[in-house]
């Protein structure tokens, strides 16, 4: 994760390790966008400690880059829980 992105997600109280963990745990992709030859995905995921995160990733040349991440809000939490119970 780039330094600017680390600072950005830190403002939301999230660490890079939490982002990577939620991604590795098989996130639910709820929206896909294409912007400037990039595929952005809005994802809902959970850390090993049960923290629910929303994050946006870009997949480029086989690598994943986190654009932003923040704690899930109510509607996202309901969608995630409904799909993963």
Question: Which residue ranges define each predicted feature?
Answer:
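Ribonuclease/tRNase effector modules and their secretory precursors
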Residues: 1-85
